[in-house]
Regions:
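N-terminal small-domain helix-loop-helix segment of the aminotransferase-like
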Residues: 2-84, 91, 265-267
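Conserved PLP-anchoring active-site segment centered on the Schiff-base-forming lysine
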Residues: 95-117
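A short helix->loop->beta-strand "cap" motif at the edges of active sites that frequently abuts
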Residues: 101, 122, 180-183, 210
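A short helix-loop-beta submotif of the ANL/AMP-binding
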Residues: 119-125
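Conserved core segment of the aminotransferase class I/II
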Residues: 211-278
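Elongated, amphipathic alpha-helices that form coiled-coils and helical stalk/scaffold elements used
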Residues: 283, 289-320
C-alpha cells in the first residue's frame, strides 16, 4: 500500500519559516518563555536543575492532574499525554481502525486524522458544515455518512478552518448518531479557548457519551506549540490500548514540555494565556476586516460564531 503524504503539512513546512506574511497560520503568535514564567510568577532558576530525563511515559503526574481537572468526571487514568495533538490523532487512528473500516469525518477540516485513516486502508466519508447556512451542520450528509459499519465519527470543535462552533443541539445530533451505530466519537478541541466572541471555552464533548474521546493540546489556544504537549481523555480501557501505540511511536513527550505544560495549566496561568489569545484574535480580526474593506473586493467574512441554525428536535429523534 502506498503511504500518502500529508500534502498540506508539507506545503506549510516548506514555506512557513520563510514567508513574511503567513495567512495559513492557524494559531496565535507564540508565547515567549519569559512571558510564561511571568504569568506563573516563576523563576527561570527553578528549571535549571531539572534533570533532562524521560518523564512518566503517559505524562507527568502533575500535568495529568491539571488536565484531569478540565474535564468533569475524568480521572487520572482517563488521561494520556502525547507529543502534541498530532500524535494523539495518529495513535487513535492506529488503535481504532483497520483496513476496510468506515470513518465519518466532519469537513472542512485539518486533514491529519482522515489522512492517517486512509493510510490504514479505512474508508473515509465526509459530512459537511454547510457554507450556505453559516456553516451549520449538514444533517442530511451526516445521515448518509454514518452507517452501521461506521467505527469512528471525527469532528473538530471549534472548527478549523471555518471557526464554526457547534451548538448544543448540533453536538446532540452527533452524539445521537454515534450512539445509534455504537461508533467512537473523536472530538479534537484544540481551539477551545481561542473563541473571539466568548469569554469561556466551548463546552467539551467529554462525558456526553461513553465512547467520546477528546483530543487537546497547548499549541493553538494556549500559544505554546513549541512545547509539543497534547493529550487524550478517553475511557480507561482505551487509554491502555493507546499507551501501547504511544510506546512504539514517541515513548514520551519531553521533560521540559511536561513541566512547562503543567505550569501553563495552573488556573491563574491558564486564564492569562487564554485572555492573551482572545486579545490577539480580536485584534487580528479587526485588522483583517480593515484590509478586506479596502482591498478585498468580492471577499466577505461570515461571522459563524454568532450564527445558529439549530436542527429541530425531530431531526435529533430521527437518529435514535
Amino acid at each position: 500500500m502506498i503511504f500518502k503524504a500529508f500534502d498540506l503539512e508539507r506545503l506549510l513546512s516548506d514555506w512557513e519559516q520563510t514567508v513574511e506574511f503567513n495567512f495559513a497560520e492557524s494559531g496565535v503568535h507564540p508565547v515567549p518563555l519569559k512571558e510564561l514564567l511571568e504569568f506563573a510568577d516563576a523563576d527561570l532558576n527553578e528549571f535549571l536543575d531539572i534533570p533532562l530525563n524521560y518523564p512518566e511515559v503517559n505524562g507527568d503526574l502533575k500535568l495529568r492532574q491539571r488536565i484531569q481537572e478540565l474535564y468533569n468526571g475524568a480521572g487520572l487514568d482517563n488521561v494520556i499525554v502525547t507529543v502534541g495533538a498530532s500524535e494523539a490523532n495518529y495513535i487513535l487512528a492506529n488503535t481504532l481502525l483497520m483496513e476496510g473500516d468506515e470513518v465519518a469525518v466532519m469537513g472542512p477540516t485539518y486533514m491529519q486524522f482522515s489522512g492517517a485513516a486512509s493510510n490504514l486502508g479505512a474508508k473515509v466519508k465526509t459530512f459537511s458544515l454547510n457554507e450556505n447556512k453559516a456553516w451549520a451542520l449538514d444533517i442530511e450528509e451526516l445521515q448518509e455518512a454514518v452507517t452501521p459499519n461506521t467505527k469512528v465519527i471525527a469532528v473538530v470543535n471549534p472548527n478549523n478552518p471555518t471557526g464554526k462552533i457547534l451548538s448544543e443541539k448540533e453536538m446532540d445530533v452527533l452524539i445521537t448518531a454515534a450512539e445509534k451505530v455504537n461508533a467512537w466519537l473523536i472530538a479534537d478541541e484544540v481551539y477551545g479557548g481561542a473563541e473571539r466572541e466568548k469569554t469561556q471555552p466551548t463546552s467539551s464533548f467529554y462525558g456526553k457519551y461513553n465512547k467520546v474521546i477528546t483530543v487537546n493540546g497547548l499549541s493553538k489556544a494556549y500559544g505554546l506549540p513549541g512545547l509539543r504537549i497534547g493529550w487524550i481523555v478517553a475511557p480507561v480501557n482505551l487509554i491502555q490500548e493507546l499507551w501501547k501505540r504511544h510506546e512504539y511511536t514517541t515513548v514520551s513527550s519531553s521533560m521540559l514540555g511536561n513541566r512547562l505544560g503543567e505550569m501553563a495549566l495552573r488556573p491563574h496561568v491558564r486564564r492569562q494565556l487564554l485572555d492573551r489569545t482572545r486579545k490577539l484574535v480580536g485584534q487580528g480580526f479587526d485588522v483583517l476586516q480593515q484590509i478586506l474593506d479596502e482591498y478585498g473586493s468580492g471577499i466577505q467574512i461570515t461571522q459563524v460564531q454568532t450564527q445558529k441554525a439549530d436542527p429541530p428536535d425531530q431531526v435529533i429523534d430521527a437518529f435514535r
